[in-house]
């Protein structure tokens, strides 16, 4: 789980009554997964070939990083001192809902580890160690170590994220988490251990935005795996019904779909087959 730290480590878990104030906060409107996002996360991930189409762009990067030949979902940063280096994804999104998973080991983040989105004009290199993603008006980033959101950082103050944190608290972001970009609503959000953390940025509609990260740790390796996307059309009733059935069963009981008194074709549909 993502962890919330004060004097000691506290685990963010809505099922734990010890953290009832936090539980109530996370159950508030801003922390409820949007319906379309909930549906997308229930869908099987896209094929590896599609993931490659949405992976890091080896032609759109700082010279101090490179996409690995043996795993093109991962990029590697050279151990260059006093340098902050970034890379964009291959695909810029203008419409639809898109979710990708970032895997970035906590021990490889260093002082400035930032994940977010950027236009094609955002810089991908800076001298020194800095919050490069979110540094100007061309990018939007979440600093994983500081729990701060940055956009146009030279002119605008950063904001706490997740927003429920108190001033003396720190949220420990685990090795893997999800990024959700909704270009129809114009929002960027993050999901940690299945918990929707709320909207991080708004006002993104009408832009063309690419996945981006900036890093300072030598030899760090960061993986991006595109999970799936949804077009902006209204959700089909059949898809909504399928989601309702799967929710009623729960993930641990999805295997029981085969025992339901339903036609084989409907069972296959419920199982995304």
UniProtKB/Swiss-Prot annotation:
Changing residue 31 to F: Loss of phosphorylation. It is found in: Cytoplasm; Cytoplasm, Cytosol. One of its GO terms (cellular component) is SCF ubiquitin ligase complex. Its main location: cytoplasm. It comes from the Eukaryota. Pathway: Protein modification; protein ubiquitination. GO terms for biological process: proteasome-mediated ubiquitin-dependent protein catabolic process; protein ubiquitination; ubiquitin-dependent protein catabolic process. Pfam families: SOCS_box, SPRY. InterPro entries: B30.2/SPRY, B30.2/SPRY_sf, ConA-like_dom_sf, FBXO45-Fsn/SPSB_families, SOCS_box, SPRY_dom. This is SPRY domain-containing SOCS box protein 1. It comes from Homo sapiens.
């Amino acid at each position: 789980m993502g962890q919330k730290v004060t004097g000691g480590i506290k685990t963010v878990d809505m099922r734990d009554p010890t953290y009832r104030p936090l539980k109530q906060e996370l159950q508030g409107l801003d922390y409820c997964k949007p319906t379309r996002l909930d549906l997308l996360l229930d869908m099987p991930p896209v094929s590896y070939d599609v993931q490659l189409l949405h992976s890091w762009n080896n032609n759109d990067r700082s010279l101090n990083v490179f996409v690995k030949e043996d795993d093109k979902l991962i990029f590697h940063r050279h151990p260059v001192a006093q340098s902050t280096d970034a890379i964009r994804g291959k695909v810029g999104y203008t419409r639809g809902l898109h979710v990708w998973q970032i895997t970035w080991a906590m021990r490889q983040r260093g002082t400035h580890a930032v994940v977010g989105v950027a236009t094609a004009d955002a810089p991908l290199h800076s001298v020194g160690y800095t919050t490069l993603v979110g540094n100007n008006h061309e990018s939007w980033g979440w600093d994983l170590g500081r729990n701060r959101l940055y956009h146009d950082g030279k002119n605008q103050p950063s904001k706490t994220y997740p927003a429920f944190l108190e001033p003396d608290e720190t949220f420990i972001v685990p090795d893997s988490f999800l990024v959700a970009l909704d270009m129809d609503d114009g929002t960027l959000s993050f999901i940690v251990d299945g918990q929707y953390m709320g909207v991080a940025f708004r006002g993104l509609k009408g832009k063309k935005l690419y996945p981006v990260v900036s890093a300072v740790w030598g030899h760090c390796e960061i993986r991006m795996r595109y999970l799936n996307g949804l077009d902006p059309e209204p959700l089909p009733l059949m898809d909504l019904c399928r989601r309702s059935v799967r929710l009623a069963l729960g993930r641990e009981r999805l295997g029981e779909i085969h025992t339901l008194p339903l036609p084989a074709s409907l069972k296959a549909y419920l199982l995304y087959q």
